[in-house]
Design a protein with these regions (language model features):
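N-terminal active-site segment of His-dependent metallophosphoesterases
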Residues: 23-81
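Bacterial Sec-dependent N-terminal signal peptides
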Residues: 1-29, 207-208
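Short acidic, glycine-rich surface-loop motifs adjacent to enzyme active sites
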Residues: 172-191
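Hydrophobic beta-strand anchors of alpha/beta hydrolase catalytic cores
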Residues: 33, 66, 130, 181-182
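Extended active-site neighborhood of metal-dependent phosphoesterases/phosphodiesterases
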Residues: 78-171, 175-176, 198-215, 225, ...
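Histidine-centered catalytic micro-motifs
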Residues: 183-189, 216-226
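Active-site glycine-centered loops adjacent to acidic/histidine catalytic or metal-binding residues
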Residues: 38, 70-71, 98-99, 186, ...
């Protein structure tokens, strides 16, 4: 007999997310994690302070793990402070590859430098199965190529694909667990990933095969905006940047920062930083 299950995920979004799901499954134990996206920490004056406040919140909330959804920081010595801050959290920590993480590196270099298990991977926490996807692939109609060292500044129609190998892995990974599943990606599979419809079909097919609402949530970043939507029973949540909104026009940054700061951080010229993360 069906009963209502209350699945609780506590997120660093200024809200407690409660999902009521009809299922025959047992009631899951709560999992608490702190999530952020698009720090762009080396590119803004207070990147260290923003990341520090995130880590402080994770400690205060006694999170089970933390995760960032890409466009985090670089691998050079100047970014060492961000790596040290991130690694100061004593529990599990996870990264997602963002497009700008591929501005100076190959995926192999970045995965190794960030101590990631792979460019896409999965892990379990309590009664939940979490999946990290990688949408940083080019496809010109002939072949798939991963973003690497800024090679993706080409026709926008070629960008943001999930490669076939990853799609097959996703099918097998979903089928291998009976836990409820939550996905993370930099680009949104509901709007931005070019073959997102195919990815969503995999998720929906698995829900149908499993006979219960197995895939419940998919988080993304990249667009520096907030929204949530439901597509065929699966909730998609976009996480805003922890740092700024890109406006793609002069932002009058000279009214907000001194000249030497604007010279050091040219990104400020076309963006508006948030007061706090």
């Amino acid at each position: 007999m069906n009963k209502t299950i209350q699945t609780t995920l506590q997120l660093f979004l200024g809200a407690l997310i409660l999902l009521n799901i009809s299922s025959c499954q047992k009631q899951e134990k709560p999992v608490k994690f702190i999530i952020a996206s698009d720090f762009h920490a080396p590119d803004i004056p207070d990147g260290k302070e923003r990341l520090a406040s995130f880590i402080e919140a994770a400690h205060k909330e006694k999170a089970d793990f933390i995760i960032e959804l890409g466009d985090f920081c670089r691998l050079d010595s100047a970014s060492q402070v961000y790596h040290e801050l991130w690694n100061s959290f004593p529990k599990d920590k996870y990264h997602v590859i963002g497009n700008h993480d591929m501005d100076q590196y190959t995926p192999e270099e970045y995965v190794k430098g960030m101590n990631m298990p792979g460019r896409y991977y999965s892990f379990d926490k309590g009664d939940f199965h979490f999946i990290v996807l990688d949408g940083n692939n080019l496809y010109d109609g002939k072949e798939y190529r991963h973003y690497a060292k800024a090679n993706y500044y080409v026709n926008p129609e070629y960008r943001a694909f999930i490669d076939p190998e990853q799609m097959e892995w996703l099918k097998k990974d979903l089928a291998s667990t009976n836990k409820r599943c939550i996905l993370f990606s930099h680009q949104s599979i509901d709007t931005f990933v070019k073959n997102g419809k195919d990815v969503r079909q995999i998720l929906e097919n698995e829900n149908e095969r499993a006979g219960f609402k197995k895939i419940v949530l998919a988080f993304s970043g990249h667009n520096h905006s907030n929204y949530s939507k439901v597509i065929n029973g699966i909730t998609y949540i976009q996480i805003n940047s922890a740092s700024y909104v890109w406006i793609d026009q002069p932002s009058k940054t000279e009214l907000r920062y001194p000249e030497e700061v604007n010279k050091q951080y040219p990104l400020l010229g076309y963006s508006i930083t948030y007061d706090r993360p």
